[in-house]
Regions:
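N-terminal subdomain of nucleotide-sugar transferases
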Residues: 1-59, 105, 238-244, 411
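Conserved donor-binding/catalytic core segment of Leloir-type glycosyltransferases
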Residues: 9-11, 178, 202, 212-231, ...
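N-terminal strand-loop element at the rim of the active site
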Residues: 17, 40-87, 187
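Nucleotide-sugar-dependent
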Residues: 28, 231, 279-286, 295-313, ...
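Membrane-proximal helix-turn-helix segments that form the acceptor-binding/catalytic region
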Residues: 35-37, 118-120, 125-129, 139-145, ...
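An aromatic- and histidine-rich active-site surface loop
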Residues: 56, 90-93, 110-131, 137-146, ...
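Nucleotide-activated donor-binding/catalytic signature segment of Leloir-type glycosyltransferases, i.e.
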Residues: 259-286, 292
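Conserved acidic donor-binding segment of nucleotide-sugar-dependent glycosyltransferases
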Residues: 337-347, 355-361
Length: 411
């Protein structure tokens, strides 16, 4: 520690400042989450960051704009050919760590975002060093964890450089886990690995206009976020059309389903597709045209191992939220959320849409304001950073002085 503050080295995938707005399809939720978390942690600890960037950005860091990002001490690139660049990146990271440690001393904690090949390789090397920092996984997404992996996929990935497909085995490399997904607890605590649920927080502060209690007309629905099959956007749109409620559904975002949604909007007057907005933060002002935002996430394809970060931005709009409980969303929204059932989802969606469409607009406005207040109090990044530092400090107090935690074995 330095002056009583933890020294933290964080391995991230966040962009440098001024870059992200030119690459809206890359790291949509992860970048603002990682940036805001590092900023909040730096107010409580001495934080250094490393950034791993995608090949699409190489050579395109300029010109910069005013989009958020992190000033990394080291930039790494995941480029083709993968075998060479991943091997080179992990060697760069190891050299950076050794030089930084020799110059400034060993960090207390290494935070590692997800289970990427380069960071995995570095973690496996670091575990063999003595002494070493506490190695903590920040698990935002784990698509294969708890899933049966087909033999063909195992065979295909066996030839991909530095890839560890079995995420369950990779968990054993870490001394603790900070997880976005509430369902990952069972992979850590039975093995004696400290685990903390931290579903993230809101990234864009927004003050919605005062509620218009004189507004009349049908209840309007909306969705913003990723547009792919995993997010269940198409079943949501189809369920809305089948419900035949008097209002309209508005959608904006980016993803593979954009063209499909555009075509649907052309055929149905009650469905409007607004495409990709200029900046993620623009979605909050866009949402003022609706009364209720819908989160249709289902516990499929490993999504229950993560958290839909758009829930926090939904909350900041001051609008009511209709959502499944998947990933612990109900623990964030509380009693003011309106909930869908994941079993028999299609029928539940139609019934809830009809019920919400019949609700008094003032009641929906009250719910939205209550959700916003709850998120501002309990799910801001400063509060999450405080919880993380408390979690890490508690582990370090029980850690052997030599810096090597007790061995962790598979259950």
């Amino acid at each position: 520690m330095t002056n009583g503050r933890l020294r933290v080295l964080s391995l991230t995938y966040a962009f440098p400042p001024g870059v992200s707005s030119r690459f809206p399809s890359l790291n949509q939720a992860g970048h603002p989450n990682e940036t805001r978390l590092a900023e909040a942690l730096s107010r409580l600890a001495e934080v250094s960051t490393v950034g791993m960037l995608a090949r699409e950005i190489f050579g395109k860091l300029e010109p910069r704009d005013d989009s958020i990002g992190l000033e990394h001490e080291l930039l790494l690139w995941d480029r083709r050919p993968e075998l060479w660049h991943r091997w080179h990146s992990w060697r760069q990271l190891r050299r950076f760590y050794l030089e930084k440690t020799a110059r400034q001393g060993m960090p207390d904690v290494l935070l590692v975002k997800n289970l990427g090949p380069v960071y995995n390789c570095f973690v496996r090397w670091l575990r063999r060093q003595h002494p070493r920092p506490l190695i903590v996984l920040i698990l935002a997404d784990a698509g294969t964890l708890g899933q049966k992996i087909p033999f063909a996929k195992r065979l295909r990935f066996a030839f991909k450089p530095m890839i560890t497909l079995d995420e369950g085995k990779s968990m054993l490399w870490f001394d603790a886990c900070i997880s976005y997904g509430i369902g990952t607890r069972c992979y850590f605590e039975p093995r004696g690995v400290p685990w903390m649920w931290m579903p993230s927080a809101f990234n864009f502060r927004y003050n919605p206009p005062p509620a218009n209690f004189a507004q009349t007309g049908p209840i309007q629905f909306g969705y913003f976020g990723q547009l792919d099959e995993r997010t269940s956007v198409l079943p949501m749109v189809q369920g809305f059309l089948d419900a035949h409620v008097p209002g309209t559904l508005h959608v904006c975002g980016y993803g593979k389903l954009s063209n499909v949604l555009k075509e649907l909007a052309g055929r149905h007057s009650s469905f409007h597709f607004d495409g990709l907005l200029a900046k993620p933060s623009d979605c909050l002002a866009w949402a003022q045209k609706v009364d209720v935002l819908i989160n249709p996430r289902l516990p499929i394809q490993g999504l229950d191992n993560s958290f839909p970060s758009k829930i926090f931005e939904f909350g900041m709009t001051g609008k009511a939220v209709l959502s499944t409980r998947t990933c612990g969303v109900d623990q964030v929204l509380g009693d003011e959320g309106i909930y869908l059932e994941t079993k028999d989802f299609d029928n539940s969606l139609r019934q809830k849409l009809r019920a919400v469409a019949a609700m008094d607009r003032a009641e929906l406005q009250r719910r939205g304001e209550a959700i916003r207040g709850r998120i501002l109090r309990k799910f801001n990044w400063d509060e999450q950073a405080r919880r993380i530092i408390e979690f890490l400090t508690g582990i370090l107090k029980t850690r052997p002085a030599a810096g090597r935690p007790p061995a962790i074995h598979a259950a």
